[in-house]
Amino acid sequence: MSMEYQERYVRKVATILSSKTKHTTGCLIEGESDVCLEFQIELINALQDNHGLVYHLDFNDYTSETDCLAALKKARKQLRSNKQDGKTLFLSLASFERVEKKTMDAVKILIGSRSLGINLVVSANKRFVHLVGLTEYLVTMNKSDVVLSELYRYSTQKILASLKNENVSWGEANES
């Protein structure tokens, strides 16, 4: 039963993010890296099932902040070249906190991505004020809390969906 709740929650988040809107949207996933990455991978699969085109980058795969920024620019260019396909475009970034010294440079690239019609899915271990401004939704991941995850919309200040810890297995919240 727990996988069913987990899958339903991921599908709901993906549906909200991929529903046609007048402007690009974004989602900040906040929490421990391992839990966020597992959720993000499932979310990417669900977005692709909803006919989205997703380019995923994990900043942990790069040795320097400069390499992270170069990969980010390459990802944006790759997505921009696929814009004519009619699919909803998503740029997925894991471990955004890795560009700590060059945060503003990364944010400028993300602003440019949004202006090109690219939606953002970014995970980090803390809320970066710049990312909150670029994203419309916040997904919190807290494996030690009663509620493992909540989907929050900034503009309405409402929780749209939540998932209790007993219903899930990400990052082994079920470390039994």
From Swiss-Prot:
This protein's source sits in the domain of life called: Bacteria
- Print the keywords alphabetically: Plasmid
**What is the official name of this protein in its record?**
Uncharacterized protein pXO2-33/BXB0032/GBAA_pXO2_0032
The scientific name of the source species is: Bacillus anthracis
